[in-house]
Amino acid sequence: MKIDLTTLVTESRNQASEQIDVLSTVEMLTVINKEDQKVALAVEAILPQIAEVVDAIAVAFQCGGRLIYIGAGTSGRLGILDASECPPTYGSNPDLVVGLIAGGHKAILKAVENAEDNRELGASDLQDLGLNEKDVLVGIAASGRTPYVLGAMAYAKSVGATVATLSCNPNSPMTELADINMTPVVGPEIVTGSSRMKAGTAQKLVLNMLTTGAMIRTGKVFGNLMVDVEATNAKLVQRQKNIVIEATGCSETEAAESLSQCNNHCKTAILIVLSGLDAKSATDKLTEYNGFIRDALANS
């Protein structure tokens, strides 16, 4: 079956790099760098759509739902990367943000032939995950036409989940299935069709925004401090202390003492110092106000 790629922006030739193979190394990298500078502007152009998805994810989290990323190749790997960073950064349940890739875990390291062309596989992977109407699905594909992702999106719509797209081609088949479309149009790639480059960079920027924004909206950031971080190594033990110090102005000794009172729960330690509450009262107050330190503090 012949697939017409000529209409895809991500498959067109970039005039700026047509002679890149004869440039010096510095000249070559300069061309790449200039093209990369266009990526942030492409993301800026779709901030309203990104915000809409962030708000939908925050509502899902508050109602017992999840964020599911699904993609093939680079797109799938980027979703898995973003999902895997949420538990250590925000202390979130590993099941709260999930990344799926066509071909399964083995496809993270090595391409699985034809997996992305299997529309039914996308649907069955979501069935196995128990996708439901509380969840948000973000389908990721630079081309906007990957069958695996299209199958997943169609299934998600059928169960009532919120469906968003992250593609770099306007008016793609994926846009017809989505409730919200995020389409940073980054233009042709330096190496024609190599969408791991500008398209992949744009996708990573957007994914960063989605989870960061949703975590902020659900109380996991105080000021700009990651107050739900878990101390899983020596660096993070010290980071917890530093966060308590930054948030409260207390000494390192006071920070360590407050953390020891609440099983090293950074957010609770901050409230202990700022409010004077004991550990149990601080924990209860945070529970009452859904983990938002400012609200708990204002009502202590």
Swiss-Prot record:
Entries under Pfam families matching the protein: GKRP_SIS_N
GO BP, sorted A to Z: 1,6-anhydro-N-acetyl-beta-muramic acid catabolic process; amino sugar catabolic process; N-acetylmuramic acid catabolic process; peptidoglycan turnover
Root EC class: lyase
Stored InterPro entries: Etherase_MurQ (IPR005488), Glucokinase_regulatory_CS (IPR005486), MURQ/GCKR (IPR040190), SIS_dom (IPR001347), SIS_dom_sf (IPR046348)
Subunit details: Homodimer.
Annotated keywords: Carbohydrate metabolism, Lyase
Domain SIS: 57-220
Protein name: N-acetylmuramic acid 6-phosphate etherase
Pathway of action: Amino-sugar metabolism; 1,6-anhydro-N-acetylmuramate degradation; Amino-sugar metabolism; N-acetylmuramate degradation; Cell wall biogenesis; peptidoglycan recycling
GO molecular function: carbohydrate derivative binding; carbon-oxygen lyase activity; ether hydrolase activity
Family affiliation: Belongs to the GCKR-like family. MurNAc-6-P etherase subfamily.
Catalysed reactions, semicolon-separated: N-acetyl-D-muramate 6-phosphate + H2O = N-acetyl-D-glucosamine 6-phosphate + (R)-lactate
Transmembrane segments: none
Described function: Specifically catalyzes the cleavage of the D-lactyl ether substituent of MurNAc 6-phosphate, producing GlcNAc 6-phosphate and D-lactate. Together with AnmK, is also required for the utilization of anhydro-N-acetylmuramic acid (anhMurNAc) either imported from the medium or derived from its own cell wall murein, and thus plays a role in cell wall recycling.
Active-site residues per Swiss-Prot or TrEMBL entry: E85 (proton donor), E116
Documented EC number(s): 4.2.1.126
Keyword Lyase set for record: yes
Gene name of the encoded protein: murQ
Lineage summary: Bacteria, Pseudomonadati, Pseudomonadota, Gammaproteobacteria, Vibrionales
NCBIfam families: N-acetylmuramic acid 6-phosphate etherase, PRK05441.1, PRK12570.1
